[in-house]
């Protein structure tokens, strides 16, 4: 990650409206990963990441920041929900599986990068194997015959290679030897994923090296052989070592719904997956060693970003030790009508742009007018205020309702409207949503 904090924020601004404090916090945290790697080894070991706690109502961009961050980081990234885990000793997933999943994500990410790097070599090798299947070697009895045969074969091979690359042979059926994949599905109760993975790896390795002849079309065979050759060119041991280092030095874990495992005030009762999960998270965030398929992973330098709405509890309801391990607090603000207006227009692939593109596939044009977008934003804000505040997610509900009739009759409307677009203005929005927005009982159930 060589992007500066300003560049990271600029990239996040393309997709997320507002929430500048949260963007700055994650941008600085990401940049600090790069800064740390420039330090001498002795000092680098002492610099630990400053974990972040994002606090804000639902639908304001907490999870979206995490999603966009994952694409920007080019580092092992995992998003999990705190509610999926239980205290060690109970049925369910324990928190150490977070690091095991992160290790799997790192291995998958690096393998994909390595396969892209060796793709050209794999394609050449795959072409040769397909051509061998298409052009079997003829028997020769003398040296002169062999020389003539070689020259003829070379010309024929070049001709077939050209036709193969142009796709002229795609539908031709050939018989070719490919690796015999051993697919074993093992069902196991929650919390036993590690054992399941080990058993699957064991069965897969037992079948490694076995080959069988299969009749396939050239197009299918080429893809299968290309993947096989690419896997052969990848050094698995080297890949595992790189993945282990990537997890330990650059890994990022985003823990959503952290407020759901906070103890709500003085409420009593069984707290199997509340305080117990928090206490299990402590050593993980502070720094411990977890056994994974890559080996022992130290979590000391993994960045943890936790987020929660905290509408039924407060950050102070988390156990004090966990609060101390999330030193950077960022509050995300509730969305205003102006924010809704910007969300509908400004982000890359905005909601209005998506609906226009979807209906365009039927040959129907729709145009969102400025007054229509403003009215839609006002209704979204009003409904959120009167009922449950679900943030920007309310816009999905409203747009589906607004364009329901148009979507249903798109094919018929396209033939009658020709090139003239349907205008989505304030009057159109009021006629379709105005009554629902005003009637609180209706909006509670429909919007």
Curated annotation (Swiss-Prot):
GO terms for biological process: protein unfolding; proteolysis involved in protein catabolic process. GO terms for cellular component: HslUV protease complex. The keyword Protein transport does not apply. It holds the Pfam family AAA_2. Its main location: cytoplasm. It is found in: Cytoplasm. Keywords: ATP-binding, Chaperone, Cytoplasm, Nucleotide-binding, Stress response. Coiled coil: none annotated. Disulfide bonds: none annotated. The keyword Nucleotide-binding applies. ATP binds at residues 17, 59-64, 256, 321, 393. One of its GO terms (molecular function) is proteasome-activating activity. A double ring-shaped homohexamer of HslV is capped on each side by a ring-shaped HslU homohexamer. The assembly of the HslU/HslV complex is dependent on binding of ATP. Belongs to the ClpX chaperone family. HslU subfamily. HAMAP family: HslU. ATPase subunit of a proteasome-like degradation complex; this subunit has chaperone activity. The binding of ATP and its subsequent hydrolysis by HslU are essential for unfolding of protein substrates subsequently hydrolyzed by HslV. HslU recognizes the N-terminal part of its protein substrates and unfolds these before they are guided to HslV for hydrolysis. This is ATP-dependent protease ATPase subunit HslU. It comes from Pseudomonas putida (strain GB-1).
């Amino acid at each position: 990650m060589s992007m500066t904090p300003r560049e990271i924020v600029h990239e996040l601004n393309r997709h997320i409206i507002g929430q500048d404090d949260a963007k700055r916090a994650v941008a600085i945290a990401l940049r600090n990963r790069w800064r740390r790697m420039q330090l001498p080894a002795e000092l680098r070991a002492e610099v630990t990441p400053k974990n972040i706690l994002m606090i804000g109502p639902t639908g304001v961009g907490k999870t979206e920041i995490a999603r966009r961050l994952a694409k920007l980081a080019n580092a092992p990234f995992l998003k999990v929900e705190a509610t999926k885990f239980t205290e060690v000793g109970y049925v369910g997933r324990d928190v150490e599986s977070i690091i095991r999943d992160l290790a799997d994500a790192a291995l998958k990410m690096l393998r994909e990068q390595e396969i892209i790097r060796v793709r050209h070599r794999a394609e050449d090798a795959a072409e040769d194997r397909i051509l061998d299947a298409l052009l079997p070697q003829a028997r020769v009895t003398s040296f002169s015959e062999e020389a003539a045969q070689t020259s003829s074969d070379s010309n024929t091979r070049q001709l077939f290679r050209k036709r193969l690359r142009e796709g002229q042979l795609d539908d031709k059926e050939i018989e070719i030897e490919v690796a015999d994949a051993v697919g074993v599905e093992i069902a196991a109760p929650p919390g036993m994923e590690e054992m399941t993975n080990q058993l699957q790896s064991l069965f897969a390795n037992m079948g490694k090296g076995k080959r069988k002849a299969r009749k396939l079309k050239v197009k299918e065979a080429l893809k299968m052989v290309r993947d096989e050759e690419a896997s052969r060119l990848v050094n698995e041991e080297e890949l595992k070592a790189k993945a282990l280092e990537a997890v330990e030095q650059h890994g990022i874990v985003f823990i959503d719904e952290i407020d759901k495992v906070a103890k709500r005030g003085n409420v009593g009762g069984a707290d199997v997956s509340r305080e117990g999960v928090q206490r299990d998270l402590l050593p993980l965030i502070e720094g411990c060693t977890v056994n994974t398929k890559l080996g022992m992973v130290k979590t000391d330098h993994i960045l943890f970003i936790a987020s929660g709405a905290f509408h039924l509890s407060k950050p102070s309801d988390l156990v004090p030790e966990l609060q101390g391990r999330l030193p950077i607090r960022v509050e995300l603000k509730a969305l205003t009508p102006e924010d809704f207006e910007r969300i509908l227009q400004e982000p890359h692939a905005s909601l209005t742009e998506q609906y226009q593109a979807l209906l365009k596939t039927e040959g129907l044009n729709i145009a969102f007018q400025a007054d229509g977008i403003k009215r839609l934003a006002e209704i979204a804000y009003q409904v959120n205020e009167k009922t449950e505040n679900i943030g920007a997610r309310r816009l999905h509900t409203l747009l589906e309702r607004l364009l329901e009739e148009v979507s249903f009759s798109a094919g018929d409307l396209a033939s009658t409207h020709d090139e003239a677009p349907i205008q989505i203005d304030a009057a159109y929005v009021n006629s379709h949503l105005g009554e629902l927005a005003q009637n609180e009982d209706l909006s509670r159930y429909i919007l």
